[in-house]
Amino acid sequence: MMNAVITSATINCNSLSPSWTCGDNSPSKLLLGEISAALSRRRTVKVSCGKSSPDDYHSTLKSLNSRGRFPRKSLGQHYMLNSDINDQLASAADVKEGDFVLEIGPGTGSLTNVLINLGATVLAIEKDPHMVDLVSERFAGSDKFKVLQEDFVKCHIRSHMLSILETRRLSHPDSALAKVVSNLPFNISTDVVKLLLPMGDIFSKVVLLLQDEAALRLVEPALRTSEYRPINILINFYSEPEYNFRVPRENFFPQPKVDAAVVTFKLKHPRDYPDVSSTKNFFSLVNSAFNGKRKMLRKSLQHISSSPDIEKALGVAGLPATSRPEELTLDDFVKLHNVIARE
């Protein structure tokens, strides 16, 4: 990919739409001041980019101002200011004509616009009612967009998607699995990953913009480190994860304290999941193992079987009797679970 240098731009009252007011104490003045400060700090930001797009920080400002809105920390809202990142998100998911895409937290609709322009039909889930109204108005003339006002981590997304895909297949029998593309609210990233990855019968790819530190913990944890956790076993059980690229924090408003990153999860179809006798029991074993992370498995799994029996199972699985959970790969846990399940 080509590297480009994005330079800061000057924003002044004359460049804004008539709806903007710049009185000393107006909300718009405060919003403009914070955006200008954020942009002045990003003198040079290197990103891989394609063509330019007008749906950038200007439209983000105007959209927020039109609603008198300010990003809410409680909702993890950080709006994208660089339209090229939206293009790259869509590219990472290989979005094309006829795709069905789920977007979580559409915000002002800048990423949504890219997806629709590529020919995708978009279902957006948005918790903030003001943003629901904004994107509903923005895409009112499109038959490729629907937004639901719901808290994603509490909504029945599987039911929504199964109903939608069933209807689509009546008119498009050969339609592919859906995709997820989202600039995710940072405060729900782990919950979203846990919800989406087991849906390989619905989604083929999940492409998310996450905090960089979280992305590295989820995708590239090292064995025998404190970063290696049960969620890493879950991720590799249900998907093939890939860290795509880092997104500097200067590309967001408000500017977060950390950089972000784009991550792709290529979901496995259920028929390709690791062969375990019971998925529920498998993850119960994994979670139990990590509850005593620094303990040997023969101690942390005592509620499942006696220490001598756990040691025996470890031996049959080809693992040392002194094994600890952070030392086991997904395949190791699968072998251990299946040995214990047979006994």
UniProtKB/Swiss-Prot annotation:
One of its GO terms (biological process) is response to cold. It is found in: Plastid, Chloroplast. It is an enzyme of class 2 (transferase). The keyword GTP-binding does not apply. PROSITE patterns: RRNA_A_DIMETH (PS01131), SAM_RNA_A_N6_MT (PS51689). InterPro entries: KsgA/Erm, rRNA_Ade_diMease-like_C, rRNA_Ade_Mease_Trfase_CS, rRNA_Ade_methylase_Trfase_N, rRNA_adenine_dimethylase, SAM-dependent_MTases_sf. S-adenosyl-L-methionine binds at residues 78, 80, 105, 126, 151, 183. GO terms for molecular function: mRNA (2'-O-methyladenosine-N6-)-methyltransferase activity; RNA binding; rRNA (adenine-N6,N6-)-dimethyltransferase activity. Its EC number is 2.1.1.-. Residues 1-48 form a transit peptide. Disruption phenotype: No visible phenotype when grown at 22 degrees Celsius. Chilling-induced chlorosis and reduced growth at 5 degrees Celsius. Keywords: Chloroplast, Methyltransferase, Plastid, RNA-binding, rRNA processing, S-adenosyl-L-methionine, Transferase, Transit peptide. It comes from the Eukaryota. One of its GO terms (cellular component) is chloroplast. Belongs to the class I-like SAM-binding methyltransferase superfamily. rRNA adenine N(6)-methyltransferase family. NCBIfam families: ksgA. Required for methylation of the 3' adenosines in the small subunit of plastid rRNA. Essential for chloroplast biogenesis at low temperatures. This is Ribosomal RNA small subunit methyltransferase, chloroplastic.
